């Protein structure tokens, strides 16, 4: 069994911060822990907009705290996000995530992340079996 504490994990390399300062993510469970998914607590900071397009990963996102919206770029549809809401990127949806109040999100990825991924310029992460040599955001 593996037991981790969020605040303790934030003091380690499990805390990944976007180069542009829009978000940080504490990777509590990673691919190396076994299983086929990873689990993260991510903060999207107030007043930011982040372009995301997980071409190689399925993601489910549950809002714990804060407020914002997610916009799918294919159709321009906007969904408000508040505590208690979940959005599921079941079609690898390219989207914009905006926070009107800092959002605390519980995120599950499959396949699981290794922990060192950063968003590429196109908003994606590298496939699980590919080295990530593209420039990060």
Swiss-Prot record:
Seems to require potassium ions for its activity and stability. Slightly inhibited by N-ethylmaleimide. Optimum pH is 8.5-9.0. The keyword Lyase applies. It catalyses: (2S)-4-acetamido-2-aminobutanoate = L-ectoine + H2O. GO terms for molecular function: ectoine synthase activity. Pathway: Amine and polyamine biosynthesis; ectoine biosynthesis; L-ectoine from L-aspartate 4-semialdehyde: step 3/3. Residues 118-137 are annotated as: Disordered. Keywords: Lyase. Pfam families: Ectoine_synth. Its EC number is 4.2.1.108. It comes from the Bacteria. One of its GO terms (biological process) is ectoine biosynthetic process. Optimum temperature is 0-10 degrees Celsius in the presence of 0.05 M NaCl, 15 degrees Celsius in the presence of 0.77 M NaCl, and 30 degrees Celsius in the presence of 3.0 M NaCl. Catalyzes the circularization of gamma-N-acetyl-alpha,gamma-diaminobutyric acid (ADABA) to ectoine (1,4,5,6-tetrahydro-2-methyl-4-pyrimidine carboxylic acid), which is an excellent osmoprotectant. Does not act on N-acetylated amino acids like N-alpha-acetyl-L-asparagine,N-alpha-acetyl-L-ornithine, N-alpha-acetyl-L-lysine and N-epsilon-acetyl-L-lysine. Belongs to the ectoine synthase family. HAMAP family: Ectoine_synth (MF_01255). This is L-ectoine synthase. The gene is ectC.
